[in-house]
């Protein structure tokens, strides 16, 4: 490809509204342009990368035995009503009506459509297992689109759906897709981790996310220092402390704390160690208990894990904190003064709090706390659960080593759905005994457009993008110095361009009438892995200059050897 016949569209300045590196560089490198909030046009350079991600994903999913199909982006609303997800999805599900006032949605995912398809097309166990996938545009009406294509409203996604006769078959399909994901991300040259995850709105039981590791990642991932255990912060189990609760050494005393509205203020003003404090959080209760509110009690230096809380039978979903008005109506005190002693509401205690002694907590009276609280003596312990986020140094749930935390960008997710959708939509087949059996489903997604942004977050420097070879828009750049003034430079560049392209190598030939500095800057910004510089001075010495984008090293290579040198670099 010649730059003179290509839409390069690079920018010198970083747009003001681009927050993260990938968004900045995708705009500057001429990969995307914003059309509206969360909507982007993919320019030629960006589309070349997107297609490479697509092709790698397609090849590995095909190799796993899945079959490609294509489903409509527009879906009948009635299918979503069958599964009950029409309400669970909330405003992210874009609803509209056609001219006949029939309700439809723009597809954020396709569990309902694929289940309806299999319900109609597959009738016998002899047709199973089957795994169908598509690479298709999706739409989620994000409340706050941000970070470019990382959190856009319209995005490209590979979504696959497996159907099996039993759980053993589902587990086999799930593992095959897990392995296919690993092969795809390995081929892309990305540093990633598969981690245990919560199933969220999709439903089902077993679930893993695939995260590209990057400091800018929105998600926090917990890893064992001595095993392969990995989980996102929502799923990582905070293991119960392996210590006995110490015997009381203090009497419980009521302390005036008029200016201590937070744990930090309590610690600063009264000299109590933060590890000896607890936070009492009031949340809306589910229908499983009679009380309107349930209290969750965690250590003062820990954070509530909302997903773990939502998964408790006693807690309403989605998690909703009680209002100040509700707190006062129930106990006569507000946030900052709540605690377990004398509390007339059901409460659940975190594992780390269950082993505490001589601790401080709100007295359920404004401006007062109890110090020296002990379980059993001053208040009954009651229900204990894992309520908190893990922290670095916690024991690993696998029993090996401790946890370390890193940031990651979720680019893929796999689920063992079970029969959540197939049962709701009566999707079954006749087994070998002629009995109708509801199918076991798995669903699998890769955010294709998100992978592009995640790869940039992991591979960049102050000059621009540093693409892994497998994802680069072009493999090689040819930069001829002052080509329009030197006939032999032009001839050498044209000859090399013809040779490399004839070999199937993707080359960007910069034939613009531009200063060398501009040409070099653009090639580095775009992130082409291998650059060949052709100039009169180097040709006088019988060589071209080869530059590696990742290492930055420049190497003189004999003109006669340059093609073989490039072939060796591309292996």
UniProtKB/Swiss-Prot annotation:
UniProtKB keywords: Aminoacyl-tRNA synthetase, ATP-binding, Cytoplasm, Ligase, Nucleotide-binding, Protein biosynthesis
Location(s) in or outside the cell: Cytoplasm
Major place of residence: cytoplasm
Entries under Gene3D superfamilies matching the protein: Anticodon-binding domain, Bira Bifunctional Protein, Domain 2, YbaK/aminoacyl-tRNA synthetase-associated domain
Catalytic activity, as annotated: tRNA(Pro) + L-proline + ATP = L-prolyl-tRNA(Pro) + AMP + diphosphate
Annotated GO MF terms: aminoacyl-tRNA deacylase activity; ATP binding; proline-tRNA ligase activity
Gene Ontology cellular component annotations, sorted alphabetically: cytosol
A Pfam family of this chain: tRNA-synt_2b
Record GO biological process: prolyl-tRNA aminoacylation
Source domain of life: Bacteria
Assembly and interaction partners: Homodimer.
Purpose: Catalyzes the attachment of proline to tRNA(Pro) in a two-step reaction: proline is first activated by ATP to form Pro-AMP and then transferred to the acceptor end of tRNA(Pro). As ProRS can inadvertently accommodate and process non-cognate amino acids such as alanine and cysteine, to avoid such errors it has two additional distinct editing activities against alanine. One activity is designated as 'pretransfer' editing and involves the tRNA(Pro)-independent hydrolysis of activated Ala-AMP.
Entry similarity comment: Belongs to the class-II aminoacyl-tRNA synthetase family. ProS type 1 subfamily.
UniProt comment concerning the protein's domains: Consists of three domains: the N-terminal catalytic domain, the editing domain and the C-terminal anticodon-binding domain.
Full protein name: Proline--tRNA ligase
């Amino acid at each position: 490809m010649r730059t003179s016949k290509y839409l390069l569209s690079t920018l010198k300045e970083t747009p003001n509204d681009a927050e993260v590196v990938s968004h900045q560089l995708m705009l500057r490198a001429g990969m995307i342009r914003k059309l509206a909030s969360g909507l982007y046009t993919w320019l030629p350079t960006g589309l070349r990368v997107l297609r490479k991600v697509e092709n790698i994903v397609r090849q590995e999913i095909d190799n796993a035995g899945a079959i490609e199909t294509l489903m409509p982006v527009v879906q009948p609303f009635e299918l979503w009503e069958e599964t009950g997800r029409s309400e669970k999805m909330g405003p992210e599900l874009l609803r509209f009506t056609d001219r006949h006032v029939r309700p439809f949605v723009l597809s954020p995912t396709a569990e309902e459509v694929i289940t309806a398809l299999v319900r109609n097309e597959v009738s016998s166990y002899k047709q199973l297992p089957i795994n169908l996938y598509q690479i298709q545009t999706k739409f989620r009406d994000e409340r706050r689109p941000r970070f470019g294509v990382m959190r856009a409203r319209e995005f490209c996604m590979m979504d696959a759906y497996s159907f099996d006769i039993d759980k053993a078959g589902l587990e086999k399909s799930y593992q095959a897709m897990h392995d296919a994901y690993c092969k795809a991300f390995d081929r892309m040259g990305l540093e990633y981790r598969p981690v245990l995850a919560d199933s969220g709105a999709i439903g089902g039981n077993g679930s893993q996310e695939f995260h590209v590791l990057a400091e800018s990642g929105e998600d926090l991932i917990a890893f064992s220092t001595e095993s392969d255990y990995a989980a996102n912060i929502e799923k990582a189990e905070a293991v119960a402390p392996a210590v006995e609760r110490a015997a009381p050494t203090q009497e419980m005393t009521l302390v005036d704390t008029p200016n201590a509205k937070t744990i930090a203020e309590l610690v600063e003003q009264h000299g109590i160690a933060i590890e000896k404090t607890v936070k009492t959080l009031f949340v809306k209760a589910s229908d499983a208990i009679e009380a309107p509110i349930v209290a969750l009690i965690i250590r003062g230096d820990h954070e509530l894990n909302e997903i773990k809380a939502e998964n408790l039978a006693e807690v309403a979903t989605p998690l909703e904190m009680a209002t100040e008005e509700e707190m006062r109506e129930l106990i006569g005190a507000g946030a900052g003064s709540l605690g377990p002693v004398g509390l007339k509401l059901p409460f659940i205690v975190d594992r780390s709090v269950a082993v505490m002694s001589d601790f401080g907590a709100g007295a359920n009276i404004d401006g007062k706390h109890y110090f020296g609280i002990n379980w059993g003596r001053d208040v009954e312990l009651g229900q204990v659960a894992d309520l908190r986020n893990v922290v670095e140094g916690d024991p690993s749930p696998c029993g090996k080593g401790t946890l370390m935390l890193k940031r990651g960008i979720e680019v893929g997710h796999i689920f063992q759905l079970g029969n959540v959708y197939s049962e709701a939509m009566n999707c079954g087949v006749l087994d070998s005994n002629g009995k109708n059996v509801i199918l076991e489903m798995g669903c699998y997604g890769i955010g294709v457009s998100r992978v592009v942004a995640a790869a940039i977050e992991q591979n960049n420097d102050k000059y621009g993008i540093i693409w892994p070879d497998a994802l680069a828009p072009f493999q090689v750049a040819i930069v001829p110095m002052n080509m329009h003034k030197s006939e032999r430079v032009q001839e050498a560049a044209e000859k090399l361009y013809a040779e490399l392209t004839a070999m199937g190598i993707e080359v960007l030939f910069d034939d613009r009438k531009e200063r060398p500095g501009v040409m070099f800057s653009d090639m580095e910004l775009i992130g082409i892995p291998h650059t060949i510089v052709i100039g009169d001075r180097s040709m006088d010495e019988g060589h071209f200059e080869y530059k590696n984008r990742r290492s930055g090293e420049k190497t003189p290579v004999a003109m006669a050897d340059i093609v073989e040198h490039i072939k060796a670099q591309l292996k």
